[in-house]
Curated annotation (Swiss-Prot):
Belongs to the LpxH family. GO terms for cellular component: cytoplasm; extrinsic component of plasma membrane. It comes from Pseudomonas entomophila (strain L48). GO terms for biological process: lipid A biosynthetic process. Binds 2 Mn(2+) ions per subunit in a binuclear metal center. Its EC number is 3.6.1.54. Mn(2+) 1 binds at residues 7, 9, 40, 196. Substrate binds at residues 78-79, 121, 159, 163, 166, 194. This is UDP-2,3-diacylglucosamine hydrolase.
Length: 240
């Protein structure tokens, strides 16, 4: 069994989500061959050198799962792209490139966080290119801690206000971008998060059936994609 999740946005202000995640680690994830976390694992991450006690506790929980035999893969999201190798080594997980193609359920599957599919959100795409530039990343990681904290708060506030103002179609994936990206990687299944719109979309690419599986965000309930001998099963679960 393989589990895929995304968009937990873990933060101290949401202990219910944290508890649900820890329950997953102690339950289904213990029986999984691998756990894939496809971005926005944390609500914010300003650097491996600035881990809070809360974030350290999550790191320790991941390490316990890794030590139990479950392989953990972590992909950057738009809110936690400063997660680095120091955190991954401590947590016992492997940092996964976005995008990545893996073998899953007997087929090649494309994994993405999903933000790069939202090409109609021109403002965000421009900001993303700037922030992910190697020079920008180096500067961000070397800013004083207080400056990084202020910048993170500012970016989060602006992101929330702009998302509320934007047309819902703009912040969703661009329909034409999906088949183009899937064809470029030679896959018939795409799994991503980011949009907070969980669903399994049936597609046709080059005359062949295909599908786009969108993982859900953890807010009022959790979401996980389970891949086993029964196939691909996307389902929510209630917080206990």
């Amino acid at each position: 069994m393989i589990l895929l999740i995304s968009d937990l946005h873990l933060q101290e202000e949401r202990p219910d989500i944290t508890r649900a995640f820890l329950d997953l680690l102690d339950g289904r994830a213990r029986h999984a061959k691998a756990l894939y976390i496809l971005g926005d694992f944390f609500e914010a991450w300003i650097g491996d050198d600035a881990m809070t006690p809360f974030q350290r506790s999550i790191c320790q929980a991941l390490r316990q799962l890794s030590d139990s035999g479950t392989t953990i893969y972590l992909m950057h999201g738009n809110r936690d792209f400063l997660i680095g190798q120091a955190f991954c080594q401590a947590a016992g997980c492997t940092l996964l490139d976005d995008p990545s193609v893996i073998e899953l359920g007997g087929e090649a599957v494309l994994l993405m966080h999903g933000d790069t599919l939202c090409t109609r959100d021109v403002g965000y795409m421009k900001l993303r290119r700037y922030l992910r530039n190697p020079l920008s990343l180096w500067i961000l990681r070397h800013l004083p801690l207080s400056t990084r904290q202020k910048l993170a708060r500012k970016l989060r506030s602006e992101s929330k206000s702009q998302t509320r103002m934007k047309n819902t179609e703009i912040v969703d994936v661009t329909p034409d971008e999906v088949p183009k990206v899937m064809a470029a990687h030679g896959v018939r299944t795409l799994v991503h998060g980011h949009t907070h719109r969980p669903a399994i979309h049936k597609l046709v690419i080059d005359g062949q059936p295909a599908r786009r599986i969108v993982l859900g965000d953890w807010d009022r309930r959790g979401w996980a994609l389970q891949v086993d001998e029964q196939g691909f099963q996307l389902a929510p679960f209630e917080f206990s």
